[in-house]
A protein has these predicted regions:
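N-terminal export/membrane-targeting signals
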Residues: 1-29
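Signature of exported/secreted
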Residues: 32-36, 41-388
Length: 388
């Protein structure tokens, strides 16, 4: 158990847990999208044309979207710009790239990850100040390299997946997972999330050894905290002027892995230079990591314990482009560097781990399904033949 290679593997499992679990299931702060207020009431503009809408059961239904009359006006009497969600059906594509270097027992370990998740968001109904939405994971792509050992998975191209991929079943379990999110339309706080039990069950079936850990880090509170940043990048008062700033804070308790506190400072910067129809919001993020509060707490099935940590975030920046006409975040980009040390205990032996990590995330919205659904076929498709 004390062999250096085993220890490095265990540490990697812990550090990989957050990116996998926080699939942005609901889009973390970095997955937050910029949002714009409708310029005027125009159902034809805001509603994806029928011919462009994706087909199949995964297609969000426009009839479920909140009515146009609920959208706030473009500007108030003071000339401020009003930002508000319209809660119409839309899709998200979220890509996160992580470069990580660790030094464990004088051994250098590098890890590179590129993760892409495809989501659909479908408004189901409104109940007073509440709106209920369904979020579905439509596709998952992973490209991971740990110390020169590649792991790849692509749910959109099953034939390209390696049957010997040790994490293939785990990645597959993420695909097609569905959640029901109840959101306060005024505060953008997530009041309730349904689908947690079924989601955890799927992941446990794919890897039963992870059950204790998943039960701890995928609590309902944790899922709510991960969901809120998708919507609450705009101020609750709605109307802003250039230079206006506002703050948000979230805490993500990952049990035996530790606690992550994010402090976000947003600043409205006016119309985007490249596209005047989008409003630009700058983001400054401060990420603070705290080790598990109780040293005696169960390790959640992990073969090690995190006893202490000194991690500092640097160069954190981001931009949100909000589409007021469609009432949603059109695009967001964020990046952050994390550096420091972790004190890990395994088998009664304390070891120091030096960590250096750079992460960037881009999230884009669309009216059409970014994942092409192909009919089942026993024969592999001819790449030269156009899809029908």
């Amino acid at each position: 158990m004390l062999h250096a290679r085993r220890l490095m593997g265990f540490v990697l499992v812990a550090l990989m847990a957050l990116p996998f679990v926080a699939v942005d299931l609901f889009g973390q702060a970095k997955d937050d999208k910029t949002k714009k207020e409708p310029v005027k009431t125009d159902t034809k503009k805001d509603t994806p044309k029928e011919k462009d809408a994706p087909k199949g059961k995964d297609t969000p239904k426009e009839k479920d979207a909140p009515k146009e009359k609920d959208a706030p006006k473009e500007k108030d009497a003071g000339g401020k710009v009003a930002l508000a969600w319209k809660f119409k059906p839309f899709y998200q594509t979220m890509t996160t790239t992580t470069d990580q270097k660790m030094k464990v027992m004088s051994n250098d370990v590098t890890q590179k990850q590129t993760q892409t998740f495809y989501f659909s968001w479908t408004p189901i109904k409104e109940e007073g100040d509440k709106v209920i939405l369904e979020q579905k994971i439509l596709g998952v792509k992973m490209d991971i390299d740990i110390g020169g050992s590649p792991i790849r998975y692509d749910s959109t191209a099953p034939g390209a997946n390696n049957a010997n991929n040790p994490l293939g079943q785990f990645f597959q379990a993420l695909n097609n997972s569905t959640f029901t999110v109840t959101l306060d339309r005024k505060t953008y706080k997530v009041l309730k999330i349904d689908g947690r039990d079924e989601f955890v069950k799927k992941l446990v079936n794919a890897n039963k050894q992870m059950q204790p850990l998943l039960n701890k880090i995928l609590s309902e509170d944790a899922l709510r905290e991960m969901a809120e940043p998708t919507f609450n990048v705009i101020p609750t008062e709605g109307a802003v002027e250039i230079g206006k700033t506002w703050k948000k804070a979230t805490t993500l308790d990952m049990g035996p892995i530790g606690k992550y506190t994010n402090e976000y400072t947003y600043k409205y910067e006016g119309a985007d230079a490249a596209n005047k129809n989008l409003d630009k919001i700058g983001i400054d993020t401060k990420l603070t990591y705290l080790p598990p509060e109780k040293a005696s707490e169960s390790a959640g099935g992990l073969p090690f314990r995190i006893k202490g940590a000194k991690l500092e975030s640097k160069n954190s920046k981001g931009t949100v482009l909000f589409n007021r006409e469609k009432g949603r975040v059109e695009k967001s980009t964020t990046s952050i560097d994390l550096n420091g040390t972790l004190d890990i205990e395994i088998g009664g032996q304390l070891t120091s781990v030096t960590l250096s990590q750079s992460q960037s995330t881009e999230v884009t919205s669309s009216d059409t399904n970014p994942v092409e659904t192909k009919p089942a076929d026993t024969k592999p498709a001819d790449p030269k033949q156009p899809s029908k």
